[in-house]
């Protein structure tokens, strides 16, 4: 039985893209993946994630990735962007005729459920799916490692801005320093619609065009 798991990384980040990943895998491999430590990527060290990334690639039928960059995220509702990415992955995985497609739920996911049904699969759209289902944990790891690699490349160009999340003091200080030097130009790696910018870099802040 083929299963597909879908999850994202970087949804709440202030810097860099959101990465949505899908993994198609034979259910016979789930026990093995669980035994070697495949679980929610947030509970793993970077070294462990990178090791498991290679194992997941080896044992999966397919990996599908969709990236959403700050300009897109600043222009639309984040849930809608996430759903669109998930639907794109669902369509790309339909060739494998998955029995069940499991998605870590974000808001009202009825559109995602409909698309899963449209490819003749059973939808399993649940909160905390990345903790409960190995195939979603695998997708979480893929998304996280891919995003981490993108962040590392960005740091080579823009300097060490920490994790890129608004709760990271290093990220906040990097934004403040950048703002002190160039208050009228926000780098394209920054999500300008994040409200923290109203306090730390007000000229960078923009309201989303859809009002969200």
UniProtKB/Swiss-Prot annotation:
- InterPro entries, from UniProt? RNase_H2_suA, RNase_HII/HIII, RNase_HII/HIII_dom, RNase_HII_arc, RNase_HII_hlx-loop-hlx_cap_dom, RNaseH-like_sf, RNaseH_sf
Where does the chain cross the membrane?
none
Give the protein's cofactors: Mn(2+); Mg(2+)
The catalytic activity, as recorded, is: Endonucleolytic cleavage to 5'-phosphomonoester
Kindly report, in one word, the top-level EC class recorded for this enzyme: hydrolase
Q: How is the cofactor bound?
A: Manganese or magnesium. Binds 1 divalent metal ion per monomer in the absence of substrate. May bind a second metal ion after substrate binding.
Question: Which BP terms does GO give this entry?
Answer: DNA replication, removal of RNA primer; mismatch repair
Instruction: Return the GO cellular component terms, semicolon-separated.
Output: cytoplasm; ribonuclease H2 complex
A Pfam family it matches: RNase_HII
* Superkingdom of source: Archaea
Its Enzyme Commission number?
3.1.26.4
Subcellular location(s) of the protein:
Cytoplasm
Against CDD domains, the record matches this protein to:
RNase_HII_archaea_like (cd07180)
Where in the numbering of this chain does the RNase H type-2 domain appear? Answer: 1-206
Annotated positions binding a divalent metal cation: 7-8, 104
Ordered alphabetically, the record's keywords are:
Cytoplasm, Endonuclease, Hydrolase, Manganese, Metal-binding, Nuclease
Any one Gene Ontology MF annotation carried by this entry is:
RNA binding
Principal location: cytoplasm
Entry function: Endonuclease that specifically degrades the RNA of RNA-DNA hybrids.
* PANTHER family according to UniProt: RIBONUCLEASE (PTHR10954:SF23), RIBONUCLEASE H2 SUBUNIT A (PTHR10954)
Concerning its family, UniProt says: Belongs to the RNase HII family.
Specify the protein name.
Ribonuclease HII
> Upper taxonomic classification of the species?
Archaea, Thermoproteota, Thermoprotei, Sulfolobales, Sulfolobaceae
Give the gene name.
rnhB
């Amino acid at each position: 039985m083929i299963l597909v798991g879908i999850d994202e990384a970087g949804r709440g980040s202030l810097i860099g893209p959101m990465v949505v990943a899908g993994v198609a895998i034979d259910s016979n491999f789930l026990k093995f993946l669980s035994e070697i430590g495949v679980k929610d990527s947030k509970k793993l060290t970077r070294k462990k994630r990178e090791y498991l990334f290679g194992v997941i690639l080896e044992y999966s039928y397919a990996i599908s990735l969709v990236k959403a960059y700050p300009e897109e995220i600043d222009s639309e509702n984040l849930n809608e962007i996430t759903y669109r990415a998930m639907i794109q992955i669902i369509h790309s995985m339909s060739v494998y005729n998955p029995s069940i497609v499991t998605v870590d739920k974000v808001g009202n996911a009825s559109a995602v459920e409909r698309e899963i049904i449209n490819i003749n699969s059973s939808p399993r759209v649940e909160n905390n799916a990345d903790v409960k289902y190995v195939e979603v944990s695998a997708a979480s790891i893929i998304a996280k490692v891919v995003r981490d690699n993108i962040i590392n490349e960005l740091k080579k160009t823009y300097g060490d801005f920490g994790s890129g999340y608004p709760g990271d003091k290093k990220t906040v200080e990097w934004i403040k320093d950048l703002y002190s030097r160039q208050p009228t130009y926000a780098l394209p790696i920054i999500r300008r619609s994040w409200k923290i910018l109203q306090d730390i870099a007000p000229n960078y802040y923009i309201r989303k065009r859809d009002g969200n």
